[in-house]
Amino acid sequence: MARSLKKGPFVDHHLAKKVESAAGSKKPIKTWSRRSMILPEMVGITIAVHNGKNHIPVLVNENMVGHKLGEFAVTRTFKGHGGDKKSSR
């Protein structure tokens, strides 16, 4: 279900402050806020998003605007389905 337009996009306050202050900085912004929406002000900034174990650097571009930060830091690793060991030559 989509968020109401009258409410506007959700961004954690601490993340919004860091984005404003790091306008021309090359250093990535560390955040645990996977639920925050990517705004046009974040384009060109590298944000290190926590995936539960470590921080994944995400370089924000125009195509990511409107999505959540957590969509770009995968939390699960797929090792592959079990199979016959003989056929894996």
From Swiss-Prot:
Keyword ATP-binding recorded: no
Pfam short name (any one): Ribosomal_S19
GO BP terms: ribosomal small subunit assembly; translation
Gene Ontology terms for molecular function: rRNA binding; structural constituent of ribosome
Record InterPro entries: Ribosomal_uS19 (IPR002222), Ribosomal_uS19_bac-type (IPR005732), Ribosomal_uS19_CS (IPR020934), Ribosomal_uS19_SF (IPR023575)
Keywords linked to the UniProt accession: Ribonucleoprotein, Ribosomal protein, RNA-binding, rRNA-binding
GO CC aspect terms: cytoplasm; small ribosomal subunit
HAMAP family: Ribosomal_uS19
Stored NCBIfam families: rpsS_bact
UniProt record similarity statement: Belongs to the universal ribosomal protein uS19 family.
Cited function: Protein S19 forms a complex with S13 that binds strongly to the 16S ribosomal RNA.
Name used for this protein in its record: Small ribosomal subunit protein uS19
Protein's organism: Xanthomonas oryzae pv. oryzae (strain KACC10331 / KXO85)
